[in-house]
A protein has these predicted regions:
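Extracytoplasmic/periplasmic solute-binding protein
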Residues: 158-173, 178, 202-273
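Hinge/lid segment of periplasmic solute-binding proteins
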Residues: 30-47, 97, 118-177, 217-230, ...
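Short, well-ordered beta-strand elements
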Residues: 51-62, 83-88, 112
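Glycine-centered hinge/linker elements that transmit conformational signals in sensory
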Residues: 205, 261-304
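Extracytoplasmic "Venus flytrap"/periplasmic binding protein-like
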Residues: 75-154, 185-196, 314, 322, ...
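Extracytoplasmic/periplasmic substrate-recognition and gating elements
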Residues: 78, 84-86, 189-190, 297-300, ...
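A structural signal for short loop-to-beta-strand junctions that line the ligand-binding cleft
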Residues: 20, 102-103, 110-111, 141-186, ...
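C-terminal capping/gating helix-and-loop segments adjacent to ligand/active sites or protein-protein/ligand interfaces
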Residues: 58, 419-479
Length: 480
């Protein structure tokens, strides 16, 4: 178990921020985020009337994560009686970003929120996020050098990508990656090896199609109505949940380029525009050509091919033997008719073993009062304690964001348990032991549109068998 923990930390320390300067050095060139605030004192916060300092926390999460945050809020409010934590739950990440942008333009902005780097880029246009550097460096409420170093380096890098000074615009909150979920009984019954490369995936999928062609409905309880599904064109050996992740991951795995950040002369990232690379990258074309070939053979596709939102729906009833999806979504496999195994997703070559780092970060909005900012900061610190980020991981399946959290006995004991979440954490340990690198792509306002249009292009290429160049150029045209 200690070996697993060491491997995870090694991997996260090697996170690659693609197309961006990692921003840890350089002379002062301007402020990317709002710095015009004063770090209030805890004494003044505690002197306020009970519940009078209201911190609104906007989140897009489902019930499981929401309930865990509510538990944290209850604990925090017991420590700071003058503070009230109000959760504002918005249904969906995009809806949350849209609501926040609208509020920045004239509504009631939350005190704090979570978001992806491209969300933060949009908020930074108007400096609606504060720089956390004042809080981090404050001798009374900040982090020591040792505490700050306890955060996983890759997660910190993502939050410091917007200028050459490495300004903190947020801290990591809920983090995940992707994994290959597979039908254990099928692989064991027919003596198949779980694929580690895309070439092996092609071979295994061919074997699967040969095997299932001779099977009857309900011949195996862990395969379901296989003959009917085949006859209806509703069986695919492997599905990939996220078209956006599929698009960018395969480009990186083939050594291509997706996007790049643009640095202005003052050392700040241009948060309103970036450079598209996927449409001119020969390696990107090669990647899509290869995957389209697998799709034409009926080996791999996306949930859209079955008119589904997630591949886990098909996997759970035997319409797929493998599904590539988020490690944060392991709970969706709980109702599968088979035993679910977890492994790293396939890669192209040893030189490009890339896997995406995903999940949100947490920030404080500049419109809040100084007392509200302090209360929000203290709440963030509370939730990101090693014990709390480990508790969050064990409850939700997301990864701890502090290195010392991986060494806590409660977390170590949990890893040895039978839950799907623990299985995922153990199953993806090879990401650290076998030379994988997490990547995070460049972010700017509108880069989420790039991702969305590239997901559409991926559906066209994989599901609809559209001409690759046409699909890519159409995506560029839609992006504008």
């Amino acid at each position: 178990m200690k070996k697993f923990i060491t491997l995870v930390l090694m991997l996260l320390a090697a996170c690659v921020l693609v197309g961006c300067n990692n921003g840890s050095t350089g002379s002062k060139t301007g402020d990317i985020a709002e710095t015009n605030y004063t770090v209030e004192t805890v004494e003044n916060l505690n002197a306020q009337a009970p519940g009078s300092v209201v911190v609104s926390f906007r989140i897009p999460f489902g019930t499981k994560i929401e309930n865990q945050i509510r538990d944290f809020a209850d604990e925090f409010q017991a420590l700071y009686p003058s503070v009230t934590i109000e959760l504002e739950v918005v249904s969906g990440y995009d809806e949350m970003k849209s609501a926040t942008i609208q509020d920045i333009g004239g509504g009631k902005v939350p005190t704090m929120t979570v978001g992806y780097p491209d969300h933060f880029a949009e908020y930074l246009i108007s400096k609606s996020i504060i720089s956390l550097d004042k809080f981090i460096k404050d001798p009374n409420v900040g982090y020591t050098t040792e505490e700050l170093a306890d955060f996983l380096p890759g997660y910190i890098t993502e939050n410091r990508q917007f200028d050459k000074n490495g300004t903190y615009v947020g801290l990591p909150f809920n983090k995940s990656t992707e994994a290959l979920y597979y039908n254990v009984e099928f692989f064991e019954e027919f003596n198949l090896e779980v694929p580690t490369t895309w070439d092996e995936m092609e071979t295994v999928c061919a074997q699967i199609m040969t095997i299932v062609a001779g099977l009857e409905d309900d011949q195996y309880s862990w395969l379901g109505k296989i003959k009917t599904n085949l006859a209806n064109g509703e069986f695919i050996p492997c599905l990939y949940d996220s078209g956006g992740n599929f698009f960018t991951t395969i480009i990186h795995q083939f050594g291509g380029e997706y996007t790049k950040s643009i640095y202005k002369s003052n050392g700040l990232v241009d948060v309103q525009r970036g450079t598209l690379c996927f449409n001119t990258s020969n390696e990107a074309y090669e990647a899509f050509e290869y995957l389209q070939g697998l799709s034409k053979k009926g080996y791999i596709s996306m949930p859209d091919a079955l008119e589904l939102t997630y591949g886990s729906y098909a996997y759970n009833v035997g319409k797929a033997i493998m599904n590539i999806g988020s490690t944060g979504g392991s709970g969706y496999y709980a109702d599968a008719i088979c035993t679910t195994g977890v492994a790293p997703l396939p890669y192209k070559t040893e030189e490009h073993k890339n896997v995406i780092q995903q999940g949100t970060n947490v920030c404080i909005m500049s419109q809040a009062s100084d007392l509200e900012k302090l209360a929000a900061w203290l709440f963030i610190k509370y939730m990101l304690q090693p014990e709390k980020t480990a508790e969050f991981a064990m409850t939700t399946g997301y990864m701890p964001v502090r290195q010392s959290a991986y060494e806590l006995q409660d977390y170590i004991d949990w890893l040895a348990g039978p839950t799907n979440e623990a299985k995922v954490h153990n199953g993806t340990a090879k990401y650290a032991s076998e030379g994988w690198q997490y990547f995070v792509d460049a972010a700017w306002a509108g880069s989420s549109t790039v991702r969305n249009e590239c997901e559409t292009a991926m559906i066209q290429i994989i599901v609809n068998q559209t001409d690759i160049n046409q699909a890519l150029q159409d995506a560029v045209g839609r992006i504008g």
